[in-house]
């Protein structure tokens, strides 16, 4: 009896975490909205007015920008509104998805509803986002025309564009599933969609280099271009699925992933967070940091662990700690959740670095 109860509890927990792949994309968007709210609350408690380093209104708007308190209140209200709208859709999607898998020969109408529900939620979220946040709408329309001045506007562009890159894998799952509305998934269309955030950020770096002629922008562009071989290997492995070439491609892909993770970790810490020393952190200034030192050290450690999470999964497979065909350690899709959380940590210390550059370093 106790064993049965234990198994049922484990199954219940697994069902909570194992959200259907297309719905996971929606859950991650909601999570990102709440993380942004918590970030603003953190800066409120830390007395760091980061509203001074990001543009909160479109450039031609003559009204003063949002204060940090206003920004936090607006973000919280928006996250609450979207969460309340999505919750009924979420439970309906999960229920119908499970129902579709249980019954034999599911009704065509149920299949169509299951395929459409995540798409409806996605359209709803982005419609409200673009309607109620004019600065996001402005930056989205001009994403390839990134403006380097004022710096606060550039920071807003970068926060939006870099956050989108963290949704590449969820986008693949979402696009694959949604394309089933048309009976069969579009061939490799999901990879094209996942490529868009990377290309946007890559082209932004090249445009900035053409305007400013700063060498670091080329190295930043190189960082984003490291994603291209990884996606190429994914595409080729599909072509050679089931053959010996597939395993060779996976091996090559892991080397590219190792290079990409190492490069991006260095860039996060050294360039984006303006930290040049693990001991003194910002060694060139007496007022080295604006937060507690242990926060920076913890962030670097967490960034390292999450950047290389794919490697921990791979090592766990080789050590037979998880199944050989498993792509997770704790629960399905964990890497996508961890990436959104890692991005939230990156945003905290990116804004901290911008605040330091504008105020503390002077």
From Swiss-Prot:
Q: Which PROSITE patterns match?
A: EXS
- Localization (cell): Endoplasmic reticulum membrane
Where do transmembrane segments lie in this chain? 25-45, 85-105, 110-130
This chain's source organism reads Saccharomyces cerevisiae (strain ATCC 204508 / S288c)
Q: Which residues form a coiled coil?
A: none
PANTHER family (UniProt xref):
PROTEIN ERD1 HOMOLOG 2 (PTHR10783:SF46), XENOTROPIC AND POLYTROPIC RETROVIRUS RECEPTOR 1-RELATED (PTHR10783)
| Membrane topology label | Multi-pass membrane protein
The disulfides recorded in the entry are: none
Q: Which residues lie on this side of the membrane: Cytoplasmic?
A: 46-84, 131-362
Provide the EXS domain boundaries: 181-362
Question: Member of which family?
Answer: Belongs to the ERD1 family.
Q: Which GO terms describe its biological process?
A: protein glycosylation; protein retention in ER lumen; protein transport; retrograde transport, vesicle recycling within Golgi
Task: Show the InterPro entries listed in the entry.
Answer: EXS_C
What coarse category fits the chief subcellular location reported for this protein?
endoplasmic reticulum
Briefly state the protein's biological role. Required for the retention of luminal endoplasmic reticulum proteins, affects glycoprotein processing in the Golgi apparatus.
Q: Which Pfam families match?
A: EXS
Tell me which parts of the chain lie in the Extracellular compartment: 1-24, 106-109
- List keywords of the entry alphabetically: Endoplasmic reticulum, Membrane, Protein transport, Transmembrane, Transmembrane helix, Transport
Q: What cellular component terms from Gene Ontology apply here?
A: endoplasmic reticulum membrane; membrane
What's this protein's name? Protein ERD1
């Amino acid at each position: 009896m106790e064993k049965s109860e234990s198994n049922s509890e484990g199954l219940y927990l697994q069902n909570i975490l194992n959200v259907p792949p297309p719905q996971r994309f929606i859950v991650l968007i909601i999570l990102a909205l709440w993380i942004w709210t918590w970030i603003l609350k953190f800066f409120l408690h830390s007395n760091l007015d980061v509203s001074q380093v990001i543009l909160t209104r479109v450039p031609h708007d003559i009204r003063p920008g949002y204060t940090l308190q206003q920004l936090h209140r607006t973000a919280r209200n928006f996250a609450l509104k979207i969460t309340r709208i999505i919750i009924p859709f979420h439970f309906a999607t999960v229920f119908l998805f499970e129902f579709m898998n249980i019954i034999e020969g599911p009704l065509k109408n149920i299949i169509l509803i299951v395929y459409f529900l995540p798409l409806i939620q996605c359209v709803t979220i982005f419609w409200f986002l673009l309607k109620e946040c004019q600065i996001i709408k402005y930056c989205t329309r001009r994403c390839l025309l990134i403006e380097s001045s004022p710096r606060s506007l550039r920071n807003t562009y970068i926060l939006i564009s870099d956050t989108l890159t963290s949704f590449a894998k969820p986008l693949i799952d979402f696009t694959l599933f949604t394309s089933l509305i048309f009976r069969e998934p579009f061939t490799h269309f999901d990879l094209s969609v996942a490529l868009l955030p990377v290309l946007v950020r890559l082209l932004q770096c090249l445009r900035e280099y053409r305007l400013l002629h700063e060498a670091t922008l080329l190295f930043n562009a190189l960082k984003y271009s490291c994603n291209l071989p990884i996606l190429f290997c994914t595409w080729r492995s599909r072509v050679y699925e089931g053959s010996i070439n597939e395993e060779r491609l996976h091996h090559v892909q892991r080397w590219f992933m190792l290079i990409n993770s190492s490069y991006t970790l260095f860039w996060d810490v050294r360039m984006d967070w303006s930290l040049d020393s693990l001991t003194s952190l910002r060694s060139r200034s007496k007022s080295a940091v604006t937060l507690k030192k242990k926060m920076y050290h913890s962030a670097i450690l967490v960034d390292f662990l999450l950047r290389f999470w794919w490697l921990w999964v791979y090592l766990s497979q080789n050590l037979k700690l998880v199944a050989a065909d498993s792509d997770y350690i704790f629960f399905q899709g964990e890497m996508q959740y961890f990436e959104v959380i890692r991005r939230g940590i990156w945003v905290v210390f990116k804004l901290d670095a911008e605040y330091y550059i504008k105020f503390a370093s002077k």
